[in-house]
């Protein structure tokens, strides 16, 4: 069904947790649905910076873009944590991990309250997508760059994606990682 979002601004990503959908987007737009997407309400945040990614874990939503923000009340109210700019966020093993331009990786083990910059080995490459599965985080981006962490985002190693195209998004399901990008789909072999 096509339902009204209640906004004229672009929405970029959606996450689900605690029976709540949260969608984030252009100029700080935050939309919240607690009835399986039938109706959408505004979350309260005092800024108008773009939000590109959102994830849920441990009863906390974390959204990021030109700011890191978090909500512990199912997206009704949001607090700014950092002014660092990132593109995507994922949650796994009680850890939030965010990625962004020039190989930026940050992680949080306290539900998004504080963040630690990590060395990704991807300096010079914009990272656009991030996911968690099989106790690993994977991030991907510019020029086919693909990196993984097996220790909750603390350290990262390069993985040969076998492509040089821009990669934009990655997901995990049925024991496979699938990344997509510019005229490209990559699938993990193990």
Per-segment meaning from a language model:
Residues 1-190:
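Residue-level hotspots at or immediately adjacent to binding/recognition sites across diverse folds
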């Amino acid at each position: 069904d096509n339902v009204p979002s209640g906004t004229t601004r672009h929405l970029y990503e959606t996450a689900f947790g605690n029976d709540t959908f949260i969608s984030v987007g252009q100029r700080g737009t935050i939309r919240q649905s607690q009835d399986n997407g039938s109706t959408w309400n505004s979350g309260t945040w005092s800024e108008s910076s773009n939000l590109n990614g959102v994830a849920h874990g441990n009863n906390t939503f974390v959204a990021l873009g030109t700011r890191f923000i978090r909500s512990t009340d199912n997206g009704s109210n949001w607090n700014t944590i950092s002014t660092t700019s990132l593109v995507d966020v994922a949650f796994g093993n009680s850890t939030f991990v965010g990625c962004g331009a020039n190989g930026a990786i940050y992680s949080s083990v306290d539900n998004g309250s504080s963040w630690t910059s990590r060395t990704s080995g991807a300096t010079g490459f914009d990272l656009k997508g991030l996911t968690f599965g099989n106790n690993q985080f994977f991030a991907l981006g510019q020029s086919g760059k693909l990196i993984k962490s097996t220790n909750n985002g603390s350290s990262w190693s390069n993985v040969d994606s076998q492509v040089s195209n821009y990669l934009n998004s990655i997901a995990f399901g049925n024991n496979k990682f699938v990344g997509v990008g510019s005229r490209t789909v990559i699938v993990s072999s193990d």
